[in-house]
Swiss-Prot record:
TM region positions: none
Gene Ontology MF terms in the entry: DNA binding; zinc ion binding
Amino acid composition bias (Gly residues), ranges on this chain: 77-103
Biological classification of the source: Eukaryota, Viridiplantae, Streptophyta, Embryophyta, Tracheophyta
Top-level taxon of the source organism: Eukaryota
Alphabetical UniProt keywords: DNA-binding, Metal-binding, Repeat, WD repeat, Zinc, Zinc-finger
Name under which the protein is recorded: Zinc finger CCCH domain-containing protein 17
WD repeats: 148-189, 191-225, 227-264, 271-308, 311-348, 355-395, 397-435
Gene3D superfamilies: 2.30.30.1190, YVTN repeat-like/Quinoprotein amine dehydrogenase
Amino acid sequence: MDIETDGRFGNKRVHHRLGPANGAASSSTSGKVCIHWRAGRCNRFPCPYLHSELPEATAKRPSQSGGGGNVWRNPHSGGGGGRGAGGAGGPNKWGRGPGGADGGPRHKVPDRPCRYFLAGDCSYGEKCRYPHSYSMSDSITMLTPLQGHEKVVTGIALPAGSDKLYSGSKDGTVRMWDCQTGQCAGVINMGREIGCMISEGPWLFVGIPDAVKVWNMQTQAEMNLTGPTGQVYALAVGNELLFAATQDGRILAWRFSAATNGFEPAASLVGHQLAVVSLVVGAMRLYSASMDKTIRVWDLATLQCIQTLSDHTGVVMSVLCWDQFLLSCSLDQTIKVWAATESGSLEVTYTHKEEHGALALSGMPDAQSKPVLLCSLNDNTVRLYDLPSFSDRGRIFSKQEIRAIQVGPSGLFFTGDGTGELKVWQWVIDGSQTK
């Protein structure tokens, strides 16, 4: 099988107060920067000194986004999109935009939509004073919700050459969705909780406890790969190998055999002390993120661990390759950007702080082909950031945590949350197109 892989792809609260509080002094006193704020320990409110190095940027307030029609189309049935957000940016450009810690203050955080609307029971309707919207961004619109799963969605895939979208859930089912009608076209009952799902070419891979299920969407061939112990939390493909991240901390590898038209065991990568929850392949390297708070770097040629990254202080939930950089997010409320040194080892070149634990990363170009990072947080939102500046592009809201994000063709992307609901989104060129 000739497989090519796109680069995919705690608990201290962080406060960002910009400028003096209302009622604070506005003369020479307010022209000074608070030394305690600089040290990260100012507890005065209001504080008479500046809590900012630069004047606050004017925040552009995005318009509402709601449900559009109930049909989306897959104009390129070959899938595409990948989980990596292409582009370039030197290490000195990280975080240099509005919202980035190095280049100026964050955008003003937008008001949240009506919580009763999100729960589906707002009695005020159009008279409600709070936005009835699943997003706060003028760059995206929600096309349709897809309902049917009864528990958290843990994987979404769009196989090449298929007109079906696939989703997996802890309810033990795989659902097939017709890309032309938005209707559920079939349900496969796996009988076990689904831990993850990916597609590569015509292949669909589904991680379940103690096994990986494999389907060829073109030939309808079905296989069952055994060897994992416990749940399979992540899958990745690279260098003609299939990798599965398991609950016991191992990463198992299989190689496709043209002779048997199947997958043969190739290796077991050992090193993590706790469950591995995310995998990504890029530049002949496999990157694995674990509950043991580390990221390991594996050489795809030798399948040996060549570096262990230990800068995170919480569970590392997701890793993503973007251009020549590695991005990681953690429950320690940070997104870290890693770059290679002259010796070839990775080190942190930028840390972006969040106010909540980060769960999942994905990347894609927007409607104007600018790279955007999508980061799911455990406050039931997804943050959108321009890369490499980390400028704020808005937020997506959900009833429960969004655990699955999948990029599609033509500006489409999909999210799956803890209630079992999927949503289909699309980037738009003009904010006036958002509904």
